[in-house]
Swiss-Prot record:
Maturation and modification: Carboxylation allows a single lysine to coordinate two zinc ions.
Descriptive protein name: Allantoinase
Annotated organism of origin: Escherichia coli (strain SMS-3-5 / SECEC)
E.C. code: 3.5.2.5
Keyword Hydrolase recorded: yes
One CC-aspect GO term: cytoplasm
Domain of life, source organism: Bacteria
Gene that this sequence comes from: allB
Positions of post-translational N6-carboxylysine modification: K146
């Protein structure tokens, strides 16, 4: 049999092992894995490289339409490809209008035409004003629904995203349970965080440490406990977003051990940055939940290696530089991290801390694909989409602003020495990023809809 592509001599991350083996591709799918596979139109030599499943980033904010000056599909998905991401799951907020019904998601599909370098699945929003329209988004094909129990959205903009109160969350979760959809939750206690933040501003406490103190660990833990219980009573599968504390992870682990259908994610910045570094970097490292102290970070590493965190995500949420100006308490909270997930975590988890390659593959790709039903993604296995990323181990470089593909070339990782490099990203058998050639093909990304899986 003749193939379109054979990748030879790379250390390939398979589901339960990593070994030097060849991978054959035909028609955009993985056709065979083994030795002496035969002929191909193209052969790539991956000697000395790790061949990983393309990352499935389950938490990405692209702000188009409506706020394309924050981030757009063209720049955001190019950055993703350069960072080894082949599939993103896009959040329903930051764009205007927020993705809360059929009409608003159709606007996103139109805005993205011809701009997607990678594939993209969609989340719908569960907000205070759309519980009677959740079925519309399910029918279109979203893979889950995001909500906030922390305060969010601009009250001066009618069609911006909104947080939900406990009643709205419960009613929404009941409906999503009936639809067979998971609810994804940003877990921080809204009232306590808001009041602590206002108190800090009144008293002139505006450092990074002050911001972290205004969103303490217990506000995350309390919110996780609350939504765990409400989702359980409502009969809805729960996914806890961007957990920042080991105590928060423990709540999820306990519920899972008791039989609840719950998963969780975290982000690289909670593992590689701490509060002192946040103080030094400034507002570019502001996010919520916040980056915490070194002791907290050590606890997060323990939870990650214990298998208590299901997947790692970017939570890429950039904004124009002027929104990061001024003191930390007033600046926009969101990190530009889409391009720096795979290489940073390969360096920190695999090279520095000894994580196995199969575990790395699960955290960066396989588990997210499974959680959100992306059946063709997340694995190097026959029949799956031929999505790969080539990683060059022990190849250090210093990230510069010019390296970035974002709409605004800023990131808290700029200036960081990263000990591994992404050299090639392949989507459905085609090279979409190469370290030497850049982006050699026109955007070929597609939207992934639930009912097409």
């Amino acid at each position: 049999m003749s193939f379109d592509l054979i990748i030879k001599n790379g250390t390939v991350i398979l589901e339960n092992e990593a070994r030097v083996v060849d991978v054959a591709v035909k028609g955009g799918k993985i056709a065979a894995i083994g030795q002496d596979l035969g002929d191909a139109k193209e052969v790539m030599d991956a000697s000395g490289l790790v061949v990983s499943p393309g990352m499935v980033d389950a938490h990405t904010h692209i702000s188009e339409p409506g706020r394309s000056h924050w981030e757009g599909y063209e720049t955001g998905t190019r950055a993703a490809a350069k960072g080894g991401i082949t599939t993103m799951i896009e959040m329903p907020l930051n764009q205007l209008p927020a993705t809360v019904d059929r009409a608003s998601i159709e606007l996103k599909f139109d805005a993205a035409k011809g701009k997607l370098t990678i594939d993209a699945a969609q989340l719908g929003g569960l907000v205070s004003y759309n519980i009677d329209r959740l079925h519309e988004l399910d029918e279109v094909g979203v893979v889950g629904f995001k909500c906030f129990v922390a305060t969010c959205g601009d009250r001066g903009i009618d069609n911006d995203f909104r947080d939900v109160n406990d009643w709205q969350f419960f009613k929404g979760a009941q409906k999503l349970g009936e639809l067979g959809q998971p609810v994804l939750v940003h877990c921080e206690n809204a009232l306590i965080c808001d009041e602590l933040g206002e108190e800090a501003k009144r008293e002139g406490r505006v450092t990074a440490h002050d911001y972290v103190a205004s969103r303490p660990v217990f506000t995350e833990v309390e919110a996780i406990r609350r939504v765990l219980y409400l989702a359980k009573v409502a009969g809805c599968r729960l996914h806890v977003c961007h957990i920042s504390s080991p105590e928060g992870v423990e709540e999820v682990t306990r519920a899972r051990q008791e039989g609840q259908d719950v998963t969780c994610e975290s982000c690289p910045h909670y593992f590689v940055l701490d509060t002192d570094q946040f103080e030094e970097i400034g507002t570019l490292a502001k996010c919520s939940p916040p980056i915490r102290d070194l002791e907290n970070q050590k606890g997060m590493w323990e939870k990650l290696f214990n298998g208590e965190i299901d997947c790692l995500v970017s939570d890429h949420s950039p904004c124009p530089p002027e929104m990061k100006a001024g003191n930390i308490m007033k600046a926009w909270g969101g990190i530009a991290g889409l391009q720096s997930c795979m290489d940073v975590m390969f360096d920190e988890a695999v090279q520095k801390r000894g994580m196995s390659l199969p575990m790395f593959g699960k955290l960066m790709a396989t588990n997210a694909a499974d959680i959100f039903g992306l059946q063709q993604k997340g694995r190097i296995a026959p029949g799956k989409d031929a999505d790969f990323v080539f990683i060059q181990p022990n190849s250090s470089y210093v990230l510069t602003n010019d390296d970035l593909e974002y709409r605004h070339k800023v990131s808290p990782y700029v200036g960081r020495t990263i000990g591994a490099r992404i050299t090639k990203t392949i989507l459905r058998g085609d090279v979409i990023y190469d370290i030497e050639q850049g982006f050699p093909v026109a955007p070929k990304g597609q939207f992934i809809l639930k009912h097409q899986q």
